[in-house]
């Protein structure tokens, strides 16, 4: 999707369909998902190599902000972990040169339930337990519901400190969809704004991992790359048939079943 102004212009196309971008100049601007920030950094470097006369900038302000800026015509494209709905698509079309708006799946980023708990290397949690933690019904790491899923693990009598995204976030949207689907009856909230009834908010993916990394007993949800970079532990998820770790194999298995609407 492309807005009217502030775009990189120039260049030509050859008869075989390949683009000759050597003469392209200008600024390509984008804004949105902080979970996509690392991928966008790679895209930016590749774009600069392919189009040395143009500049590409990405502002990782969160999916909600990226959608709003794109719809308002302030950026050339928005990065979002949640798609635009029909009304947003219509509004964006009206404000972007009357052209159709394209939504292109470009980045896959698994969401981890990341935590810091000194002395505990691995924890398994069920979707129901995760939902109860994030709405404040389970408050201690040695709660019976957690102990039941972690036989033989010495869980401390320590407060659980929930850290959530304070900005409008596609990661929040997807995490809440997961809870609502996988823990029916335990989670009612939805959307890019996470309920602020329990815990403390932090801005962006970098913000939540920074808070968790500095707080023993803390837990959050975040794109797995940020959790790994911050050296946070990632909970295995138990859907009733044993804990499933987040790794390349399990992510690959999930992607094999992925469908696009």
Can you say where each PLM-predicted feature lies in the sequence?
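General small-molecule cofactor/ligand-binding pocket signal
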Residues: 57-59, 163, 200, 235
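Extracytoplasmic ligand-binding site segments that recognize negatively charged/polar headgroups
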Residues: 110-114, 120-210
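N-terminal segment of the mature folded domain
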Residues: 6-147, 209-211, 222-230
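N-terminal Sec signal peptide cleavage junction
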Residues: 1-4
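Ligand-binding pocket segment of bilobal, Venus flytrap-like solute-binding proteins
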Residues: 67, 168-260
């Amino acid at each position: 999707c492309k807005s009217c102004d502030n775009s990189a212009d120039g260049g030509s196309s050859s008869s075989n369909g390949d683009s000759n971008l050597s003469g392209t100049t200008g600024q390509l601007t984008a804004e949105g998902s902080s979970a996509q920030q690392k991928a966008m950094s790679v895209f930016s470097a590749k774009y600069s190599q392919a189009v040395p006369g143009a500049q590409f900038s990405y502002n990782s302000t969160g999916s909600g902000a990226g959608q709003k800026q794109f719809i308002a015509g302030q950026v050339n494209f928005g990065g979002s972990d949640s798609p635009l709905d029909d009304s947003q698509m219509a509004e964006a079309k009206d404000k972007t040169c009357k052209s159709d708006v394209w939504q292109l799946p470009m980045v896959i980023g698994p969401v981890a339930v990341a935590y810091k708990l000194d002395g505990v290397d691995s924890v398994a949690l069920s979707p129901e337990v995760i939902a109860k933690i994030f709405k404040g019904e389970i408050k201690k790491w040695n709660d019976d519901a957690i102990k039941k899923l972690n036989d033989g693990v010495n869980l401390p009598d320590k407060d659980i400190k929930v850290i959530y995204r304070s900005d409008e976030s596609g990661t929040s949207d997807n995490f809440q969809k997961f809870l609502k689907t996988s823990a029916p009856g335990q989670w009612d909230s939805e959307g890019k704004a996470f309920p602020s009834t329990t815990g403390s908010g932090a801005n962006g993916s970098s913000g939540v991992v920074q808070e968790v990394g500095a707080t023993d007993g803390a837990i959050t949800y975040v794109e797995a790359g940020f959790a790994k970079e911050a050296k946070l532990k990632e909970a295995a998820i138990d859907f009733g048939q044993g804990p499933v770790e987040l790794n390349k194999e399990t992510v690959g298995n999930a992607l094999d079943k992925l469908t696009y609407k």
